[in-house]
């Protein structure tokens, strides 16, 4: 039942994402123009469309950086694995309902949508994304009282969505690894997965590599959902996610993952060692070692 609910949610997001991607590609084909907004941050026709789609008639406020910040390298050395860091200040922790990460000029601009459980003490989220061309990267947070906060930064990069896949890592599809800080307030989770974008070319055959990507991640602590993440092709190969809290994350920390081929992977970290790995099957059953 639990895995079916996750799969249904993932399939619904896939259908909506396909419609959004089609509309975005039409917009890009017609030629999105660039301009400078009030804060002298480059904007585009893509963002104007996305704002109308996700946040019609919403005031995307800007409190000071102590409430929320977004960090990304202005010139990324690897456009296929560009690090992003979202930090939430004391006033924000426990009061964030949803965070959406948008990369304006990517073929699939919504990199991730995080639904945060009520009262969850999420202080930082780190992830790696693909950057297809020079773009604004945005994080929009919805607070528990219905307000919205946006941060944006400009990244100079190109080719991240069509970059050839890297060398195969040791392990097999769906292997999940955990790395916790000594105080258990920070947890790094990574999964072995190609996260193919559909824009890459097989260097041997010259044929396009079909898209195959992680579409949903659920993170739970001590049996309670901490956050749900709907993801897509804008995540890097072998996606990783780091969550920081202002309190120790209670074990077990469990991860449930669904990909675009409806393969299910899950694993749990029991808190006995600083680093552990779990090997999973594509049938939805996983184990911890």
PLM features: residue spans?
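N-terminal secretory signal peptides that target proteins for export/translocation
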Residues: 1-15
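Sec-dependent N-terminal signal peptides
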Residues: 16-23
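N-terminal signal peptide c-region/cleavage motif recognized by signal peptidases
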Residues: 30-32
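A general "mature secreted/periplasmic domain" signal
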Residues: 34-184, 188-254, 258-288
């Amino acid at each position: 039942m639990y895995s079916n609910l996750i799969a249904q949610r993932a399939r619904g997001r896939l259908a909506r994402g396909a419609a959004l991607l089609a509309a975005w590609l039409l917009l890009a084909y017609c030629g999105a123009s660039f301009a400078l907004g009030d804060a002298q941050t480059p904007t585009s026709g893509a963002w104007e469309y996305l704002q109308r789609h996700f946040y019609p008639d919403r005031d995307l406020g800007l409190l000071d950086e102590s409430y929320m910040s977004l960090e990304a390298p202005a010139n990324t050395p690897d456009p296929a694995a560009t690090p992003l860091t979202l930090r939430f200040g004391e006033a924000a922790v426990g009061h964030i309902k949803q965070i959406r990460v948008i990369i304006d000029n990517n073929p699939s601009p919504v990199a991730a949508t995080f639904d945060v459980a009520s009262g969850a003490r999420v202080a930082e989220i780190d992830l790696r994304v693909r950057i297809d061309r020079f773009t604004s990267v945005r994080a929009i947070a919805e607070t528990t009282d219905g307000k919205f906060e946006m941060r944006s930064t400009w990244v100079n990069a190109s080719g991240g969505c069509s970059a050839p896949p890297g060398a195969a890592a040791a392990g097999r599809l769906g292997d999940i690894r955990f790395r916790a800080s000594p105080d258990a307030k920070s947890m790094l989770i990574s999964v072995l997965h190609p996260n193919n974008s559909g824009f890459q070319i097989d260097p041997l055959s010259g044929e396009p590599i079909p898209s195959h990507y992680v579409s949903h991640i659920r993170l739970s602590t001590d049996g309670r959902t901490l956050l749900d993440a709907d993801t897509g092709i804008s995540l890097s190969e072998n996606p990783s996610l780091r969550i920081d809290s202002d309190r120790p994350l209670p074990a077990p920390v469990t991860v449930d993952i669904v990909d675009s081929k409806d393969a299910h992977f899950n694993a749990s970290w029991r808190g006995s060692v600083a680093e552990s790995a779990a090997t999973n099957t594509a049938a939805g059953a996983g184990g911890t070692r």
